[in-house]
């Protein structure tokens, strides 16, 4: 079957991509905000891309078009996160 992603609704693209990796591993990503508050959130869109150099990729969607999730907001403030 051929999917034309340009003509596929975002939620349908998500379902197709999420179904490509089963079972889906879950990473727990922890961050700290600028005031010292802590956040931990589960993410399934992550993977190791390379061992040399060591490269782990984390994909984070937004809540709405202009509001990032707390994880992204915290990473932008502190430049730190733990997977």
Residue ranges and their predicted role:
Residues 1-83:
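N-terminal structural module
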């Amino acid at each position: 079957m051929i999917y034309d992603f340009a003509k596929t609704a975002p939620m349908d693209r998500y379902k197709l991509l999420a179904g490509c990796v089963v079972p889906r591993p879950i990473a727990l990503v922890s961050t700290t905000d600028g005031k010292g508050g802590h956040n931990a959130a589960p993410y399934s869109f992550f993977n190791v891309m390379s061992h040399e150099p060591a490269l782990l990729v984390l994909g984070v969607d937004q809540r709405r078009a202009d509001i990032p999730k707390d994880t992204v907001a915290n990473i932008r403030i502190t430049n730190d996160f733990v997977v």
